[in-house]
Amino acid sequence: MRLFSLLPLLALLVVQAAGQSEVTSDDPATDAGSTTNSTTDTKPRIPSQDEILGQMPSINPIRTGNPQMDAFYMMFPALGSLLKWGSLFPAYSILGAIPDNLQPTAAASKVVLVLADDATAKTRVARQNPPPNPLGQLMNWPALPQDFQLPSMDLGPQVGSFLAQLPAMPTVPGLLGAAAPVPAPAPAPAAAPPPAPAPAADPPAAPVPDAPQPAILGQAALQNAFTFFNPANFDASSLLGQSVPTFAPPNLDFVAQMQRQFFPGMTPAQPAAAGTDAQASDISEVRVRPEDPYSQEAQMKIKSALEMEQERQQQAQVKDQEQVPLLWFRMPTTQNQDATEEKTLEDLRVEAKLRAFERQVIAELRMLQKIELMAKQMRSSAAAQNGDSPYRISYPLSRTPIHKITRADIEQALRDDYVRRLVNKEAQRRARNSGINTQKANALKRQAKSQDQTLSKEDIVQIMAYAYRMANEQMESEKGKQDKVYAAYRTEQNPMMMQQRQWSEEQAKIQQNQQQIQQNPMMMQQRQWSEEQAKIQQNQQQIQQNPMMMQQRQWSEEQAKIQQNQQQIQQNPMMMQQRQWSEEQAKIQQNQQQIQQNPMMVQQRQWSEEQAKIQQNQQQIQQNPMMMQQRQWSEEQAKIQHDQQMAQQMAQQGLMMTEQRQRQWSEDQAKIQQAQQMAQQTPMMMPQMQQRQWTEDPQMVQQMQQRQWAEDQTRMQMAQQNPMMQQQRQMAENPQMMQQRQWSEEQTKIEQAQQMAQQNQMMMQQMQQRQWSEDQAQIQQQQRQMMQQTPMMMKERQWAEENPQSVQQQGPMMMQQQMPSMMQREVEDEDNKAEDDLVGEAGPQMPENEGTARHKVDALGVGGNKRKKSKSKSAPPTVINYYYAAPQRPVVQSYGTSYGGGGYGSNAYGVPRPVNSYQSQGYRAAVGNDEVDEMLRQHQTMARATHFRQ
């Protein structure tokens, strides 16, 4: 963020810093510990961005009561706030309700506002009456029917006989009070027979048949434990009278639970009172959360399909939240100036807090990466000591970039014991150091200072909401830019699509014009004329910009115009004749302008237009022969004018060719005079110049012959044009179709011949200019070589001037010796031009060593030193250094003892070693063809074997 966008904050910070500096400047000890190292506080200084972000409020660590979590929150307050309140500011939940499972557990209030149309709320459960308690229903049901009465039965003899069979027991009167409740299940067998005659449809009789089992168990217990009872101690009637009122209710709670679990639909429900049965309404509601958020009934409730889908969506959201990077709120570093100026002061403050929070999160993530890397080293060393594999647990956090770290990565890192231990130790150390530092600070600073402000949960949620809003705005703007760029790219990459679009637009315009013509013909004629004039101007501009594209478009437009003309001829023939005459006049003017601008393109276009005109003429002859005769006469008049213009152009070209011939003849004369002057200056180089002129003369003869042949062809064509034009007039008078077709074919042939002649003339002109430039370059090169002669040639020239008679005697001998070698060299040069492997002339390797660098010369042209094997099998090309040799002593003829024919080991041309040359016998100075020829004139040992290429 740029500095000028925080001007209000900067002003406040400067005033605050100035106020603090006035207070603390008296004490040197306190000034030493300040962050700013300024010694003079007379002039206020604008703080840097780092200082501004450093003065942002800190974050309160979260207190949970768990020592390990408290240590983590103390070490990483920003990360802890992100992990704790992460459900508040990701993109999908910041505008909706907060799920209960992601909310903080210590809620301030149990009252929750729920919107009825909110589909993301987990607390949205259909409100209904509590299910009835089956145990209460069972207790409300009577155990026996209301009309049921026990029959009068004397059970005394039966019980007495049963007890009489037991062994005799001593009478224990003290146990009567305690023993009376114990045999309470005993009267159950007496109650078993009466329900048998009752109807089977009576529901209260269902649980009664389960009672005999506890009764039998009770009899066995009585037989073993209470054998001391006898019939004398008990009376059956009194026993029944005491036990029936004190009948304990059976514990049927487990039965009700099983029934609710396995048969939820069979639970009998009491009808609720009127007005109490209410499902979730369509309006907002206020509900009170229950004490136990996970009640037993809510867990056992069978969920509907809608709730299952909602849970599935919430699980997907939680999974996405695990994969969202923690730094999703990262602000872009570059912003437009207009965007920053439009922000309000509150937005600027929130953005400053957001940037400070972002920097703190990045610093904490880097610290956590270091801790995880240290834990990895500790685990690997411990595993190496124990012989275990150190790669059993992966540590991906240290390898992940900071802007890609997610919540799942941090949770996986915190599962490791070593990471948790290191975090706890670091938190303890920081707690000790922070306590000492706060004590020192409180002891040193005696000024009144307010408590440091901290970022609360509301502040963090606010800055996250701002980041989410900014990210949405940036995403929309970037999407708009990308759409524009992509649209432009598609139009550039697909010209066919653009052509189709233009064609469709033109078709729509044509249809619209036809409709308007039918409605108002007079107005449409004027409008069409103005549109055609505008199109003609637009076409001329586009032809200058892009000729190739305009040709295709013009062809399509002409096809559309031809169809439109045919339709209009059928509708109104008289009006179309006048309009066609005006169009043809405009086309003739347009063709003349295009011929002046671009003749080659216009020729191709004329051929296509003539083909279209021929077809159109045939159609019109069939429709209206009288009108076509008049039109043909006007076309012939236009063609006659066109032919006259072409004849004038050909005459001008003939004049230009004659001027060019005269100019070339004068240039040749200048060359001959210059060659004669050079021959007079350097008599030693005369044979070479004569031979070169001898090779150039056939070329000049051929060029002159070609020019004369081209001129003869043009004259023949001009002579043939006049009788052809007369024949065309005679054939135009005859309205037969065959004569017109032949006449058009002959016109096309004549135009093709003219085009070929013009192309040949242009090619000849280019060849002549190229040859003239090459001759000029060769003459300049010879002049340079003449100026750069060796001191030896200067001495020879002086000697020749002093002794002209001896020079005249040696001249014919030198010519006779040199002519065979020069002829052989020229023939070989002409034969081997295609096989020339000379890459280029060597440039100066070092400027301070220019003129002394030497290259080993390949004398026989076989390519390189064969004693050294290179990586590539092909021989390197020959490189010749043409630099002027350094001044040295004259050549001394020393034949020595070697007669090897001038190879690398030969001493046939033993030259004393120059001062700055390489210290090797195989290097010789090859400074150009002239110096080598001079050596060959004096020593003819290698005259026929050496082949230097130019």
From Swiss-Prot:
Annotated Polar residues bias: 32-41
The record's account of how the chain is modified after translation: Proteolytic cleavage of isoform FC106 generates 2 further products, S80 and S60.
Pfam family, one: DEC-1_C
Region (Disordered), start-end ranges: 23-60, 184-212, 268-294, 843-875
Keyword Repeat recorded: yes
Role of this protein: Required for proper assembly of the eggshell.
Keyword Glycosyltransferase: no
Regions of compositional bias (Low complexity) in chain numbering: 268-280
InterPro entries: DEC-1_C (IPR006720), DEC-1_N (IPR006719), DEC-1_REPEAT (IPR006718)
Transmembrane segments: none
Coiled coil: none
UniProt KW keywords: Repeat, Secreted, Signal
Protein's recorded name: Defective chorion protein, FC106 isoform
Other known facts: Allele FC1 is found only in strain Samarkand, allele FC3 only in strain Shahrinau and FC4 only in strain Dilizhan. Allele FC2 Is found in both strains Israel and Ghanghry.
